[in-house]
């Protein structure tokens, strides 16, 4: 991997997601702002919206932004209007405790949330009702999450130093990367829809590029 371009932002960024063919959205949680950046030949700031929370994780589907602070997911339009939020379970308990990253299913019906304290949580994108939860001793402090083109879910464990694969029903299907592979404190991951390769990013270190086999 090599640096193709860089853009200095007005404050510290946290997360990024694709919102168009040549456009991404970046969260700046410490100024409650989402910036939209063109990524054509060079990166350029297009516009920004203010949100009513410390915006950490972000995902996009069909003109909607799923933005989270530590314990709530807020759904905004691309124009910056808040439409709904997910904070509580039907039981009255809090849905989330420490949200680190999110992603949306290919059909837009499910939001997958990586929660450092609670594990993987899947909720309905319309009403926030829990579809499934996944946590076990094989993964600790879930930080990163992504999907492949087959609908498989991949989560990385910060302190378990690994990556697990989960199916769309919330069932464990395997360990993609183990702590024996010298993966130290993974924070984020993504999969290229074109090459099928996984990019893993570790705390205070360079990224890793892995070829996945199906």
Q: What role is predicted for each listed range?
A:
Residues 10-24, 51-65, 91-110, 114-118, ...:
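Beta-rich, blade/repeat-based domains predominating
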Residues 18-19, 25-32, 67-71, 105, ...:
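Conserved beta-strand positions in repeat-built beta-propeller and related beta-rich domains
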Residues 32-35, 73-75, 119-121, 161-164, ...:
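Structural signal for beta-propeller blades
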Residues 118-185:
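Structured C-terminal portions of repeat-based eukaryotic scaffold domains
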Residues 184-214:
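Blade-level signature of beta-propeller repeat domains, shared across WD40, Kelch, NHL, RCC1
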